[in-house]
Amino acid sequence: MSYYSTSVAKLIEELSKLPGIGPKTAQRLAFFIINMPLDEVRSLSQAIIEAKEKLRYCKICFNITDKEVCDICSDENRDHSTICVVSHPMDVVAMEKVKEYKGVYHVLHGVISPIEGVGPEDIRIKELLERVRDGSVKEVILATNPDIEGEATAMYIAKLLKPFGVKVTRIAHGIPVGGDLEYTDVVTLSKALEGRREV
């Protein structure tokens, strides 16, 4: 016997598919949404649909954008000879909050993780190599998370970049091992970027 009507159960089920949302939080969110005015619910659902329909990946760096080329890649004031490699689009947001990095980015959309069945061909490493191959890149900063998968991915990319003769650096470890860039405070992230080391 279900405690909820079919509609409520379906809403809870869908909300619990979101990352970090367990059954209890999904239930709380569902009842919050149910109690919202209908126009606010429509506005929320429209914002979700619009984001899904309009957003895409930048054709250069693979960050999320609503244009063919994102604002960072199209900004002529940025240093296009320095590429900061991150795992996810949220890492770009974290790095931009520091307000010290003036280069461009490359978003891998994951890390190498044999346990999860993710190999180098499943993330955007090939596209990074193509960007470096054109010869205008002087430095690649590897800013993947300092966990096992992030370290393995950084070392793998560093090895692939050696033949290109570019400077390859790794952000310093003011960031705790196993930590996520997304949740790192601005000062720590700033110091980690400042203290990056050559790989």
From Swiss-Prot:
Specify the Toprim domain's residue ranges.
81-176
Which residue ranges run through the membrane?
none
Ordered alphabetically, the record's keywords are: DNA damage, DNA recombination, DNA repair, Metal-binding, Zinc, Zinc-finger
Signal peptide range = none
Q: Which GO terms describe its molecular function?
A: DNA binding; zinc ion binding
Presence of keyword Cell membrane: no
Matching entries from Pfam families are given as:
RecR_C (PF21175), RecR_HhH (PF21176), RecR_ZnF (PF02132), Toprim_4 (PF13662)
Checking PANTHER family in the record gives:
RECOMBINATION PROTEIN RECR
Q: Its family?
A: Belongs to the RecR family.
Query: What is the documented function of this protein?
Result: May play a role in DNA repair. It seems to be involved in an RecBC-independent recombinational process of DNA repair. It may act with RecF and RecO.
What protein does this entry describe? Recombination protein RecR
> Top-down, what is the taxonomic lineage of the species of origin?
Bacteria, Bacillati, Bacillota, Clostridia, Thermoanaerobacterales
